[in-house]
């Protein structure tokens, strides 16, 4: 199931882009607006992706209502177009059907691993177990270094995930407020150390950057996403397995006070949630 999901994530946007390009090439000489309907249906995934990549948004809404409306408007436009022509235009309906099917799968897909993780992963009130990582220089580090102060740990997939990258930038913007509450910000990467080091240099963020070699700590925390990397990225050096994007907040004693498993990448907590959790542990200096 995980590899099917990875295949879908890799191929669906590409297929939608190719369909839009072909529909545009057919509309240009044909001149009939039914092909605009085909493009509307298949642009339903391209527009949210563009929003994530260009605007750096960390969440796109629970139901992506506007994109869904565009998809169904596109289907209606295609129907009206074929009725006005008196020609069923089978290719147009194949493209519309593929677009609607892909969009519905995107909206309603459910990975059982994600819901199971809520029951077997770490929970508030538990001590954070000793976890081993590597820093950007390859030196061993562990969660023992976090004792004595609150910590916000973000386990993220890598720079190939636009939503994860937007979350990293969001934490960077909130860094003064988090550090004002005495919190250490730790970014734990599931991608190779060299890529993480380049990312840290590019962002120039004075945060704690750790790498999880072989995803051993992700396995220990039960936040591993086997086969979750989109198909094709392995050719560029990314591992086949990755993590479920997860936020842990611990107090100065190492007790877990907040956990967020992202079972749906379209729903992510606001950083103000982290601030409220920290406010219950450390008074904000005035």
Place the predicted regions along the sequence by residue.
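N-terminal "domain-start" segment that seeds a small globular fold
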Residues: 110-143
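Transmembrane alpha-helical segments that serve as helix-helix packing and pore/cofactor-lining elements
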Residues: 47-69
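Transmembrane alpha-helices and immediately adjacent membrane-cytoplasm interface residues
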Residues: 66-118
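Structural microenvironment flanking redox-active thiols in thiol-disulfide oxidoreductases
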Residues: 167-218
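Short active-site neighborhood of thiol/selenol oxidoreductases, capturing the structured segment around
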Residues: 142-171
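Hydrophobic beta-strand anchors of alpha/beta hydrolase catalytic cores
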Residues: 152-153, 185, 247
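Thiol-/selenol-based redox modules, centered on thioredoxin-like
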Residues: 237-286
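Membrane-anchoring/interfacial helices and their immediately flanking loops
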Residues: 1-52
């Amino acid at each position: 199931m995980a590899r099917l999901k990875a295949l879908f994530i890799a191929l669906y946007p590409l297929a939608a882009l190719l369909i839009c390009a072909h529909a545009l090439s057919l509309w240009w000489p044909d001149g009939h607006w039914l092909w605009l309907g085909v493009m509307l249906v298949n642009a339903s995934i391209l527009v949210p992706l563009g929003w994530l990549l260009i605007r750096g948004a960390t969440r796109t809404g629970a139901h992506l209502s506007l994109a869904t409306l565009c998809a169904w408007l596109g289907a209606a436009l295609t129907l009206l177009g074929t009725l006005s022509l008196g020609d069923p235009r089978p290719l147009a309906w194949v493209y519309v059907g593929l677009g609607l099917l892909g969009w519905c799968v995107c909206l309603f897909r459910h990975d059982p691993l994600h819901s199971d993780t809520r029951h077997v992963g770490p929970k508030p009130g538990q001590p954070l177990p000793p976890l081993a990582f590597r820093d950007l220089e390859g030196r061993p580090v562990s969660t023992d270094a976090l004792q004595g102060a609150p910590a916000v740990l973000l386990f993220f997939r890598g720079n190939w995930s636009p939503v994860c990258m937007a979350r990293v930038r969001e934490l960077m913007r909130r860094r003064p407020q988090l550090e004002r509450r005495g919190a250490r910000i730790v970014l734990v990467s599931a991608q190779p150390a060299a890529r993480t080091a380049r990312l840290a240099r590019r962002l120039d963020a004075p945060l704690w950057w750790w790498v999880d070699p072989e995803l051993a700590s992700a396995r220990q925390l039960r936040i591993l996403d086997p086969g979750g990397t989109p198909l094709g990225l392995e050719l560029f050096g990314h591992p086949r397995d990755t993590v479920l994007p997860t936020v842990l907040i611990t107090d100065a004693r190492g007790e877990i006070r907040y956990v967020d498993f992202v079972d749906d990448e379209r729903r992510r907590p606001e950083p103000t949630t982290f601030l409220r959790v920290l406010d219950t542990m450390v008074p904000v200096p005035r």
